[in-house]
Regions:
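Alpha-helix capping at helix-to-loop junctions
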Residues: 17-24, 51, 73, 104, ...
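Predominant activation on well-ordered alpha-helical scaffold segments within soluble catalytic domains
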Residues: 12, 16, 65-72, 80, ...
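Conserved NAD(P)+-binding/catalytic subdomain of aldehyde/semialdehyde dehydrogenases
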Residues: 101-162
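Generic structural signal for well-ordered, non-membrane alpha-helical segments
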Residues: 1-15, 42, 64, 88, ...
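Short, mixed-charge, low-aromatic patches
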Residues: 20-28, 50-54, 130-138
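Glycine/threonine-rich beta-strand-loop-alpha-helix active-site module
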Residues: 26-29, 77-87, 91-94, 105-106, ...
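Conserved small-residue-rich beta-alpha loop and adjacent elements
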Residues: 32-97
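N-terminal Rossmann-like NAD(P)+-binding subdomain of aldehyde/semialdehyde dehydrogenases
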Residues: 1-47
């Protein structure tokens, strides 16, 4: 029988293995194209990354894991999470449990396009993010497309995700 902790540890391990291997392939390689002229690729973590974690009727903690773990491995300094509250105004306990296990502290109780706009422009409480990740409904997708000239997004959701 699996406990929640065992399941989390298994998922965490699998996601980490994949992204750590991916990071190995991004080593800085330089070439000298002409005597004294060197070109190279350099990869740096995003300082402030925003993660949208859908909630409401079906909190997607798996999306949280698949977004947060790569951000942690990459070395992002600040991880901002926006997730909608349930009908009682509370964040789903599973989302909070995962956040605690991953040591993610900046969680905001806001969903939909409001969360995307908040992470894009910043608010009194939500820091402005440099890149935003995460799935969502058609409103979240449209909001991400609208702000894509202001902030980096991973990509709009496909038809199977909306």
């Amino acid at each position: 029988m699996f406990s929640e902790s065992n399941l989390f540890n298994n998922w965490n391990s699998n996601i980490k293995k994949y992204h750590e291997k991916q990071l190995e392939g991004l080593s800085i390689k330089s070439i000298e194209t002409t005597k004294g002229i060197k070109l190279w690729s350099e990869f740096r973590p995003v300082d402030v990354v925003g993660l949208y974690v859908p909630g409401g009727t079906a909190p997607l903690f798996s999306s949280f894991l698949m977004q947060a773990i790569p951000a942690i491995i990459a070395g992002c300094k600040d991880i901002i999470v926006c997730t909608p509250p349930d009908k009682n105004g509370k964040i789903d306990p599973t989302i909070l449990w995962v956040a605690n296990l991953l040591n993610v502290k900046n969680i905001f109780k806001v969903g939909g396009s409001q969360a995307i706009f908040g992470m894009t422009y910043g608010t009194k409480s939500i820091p402005k993010c440099l890149k935003i990740f995460g799935p969502g409904n058609q409103y979240v997708t449209l909001a991400k497309m609208l702000v894509s000239n202001k902030v980096s997004i991973e990509m709009p959701a496909g038809p199977s995700e909306v």
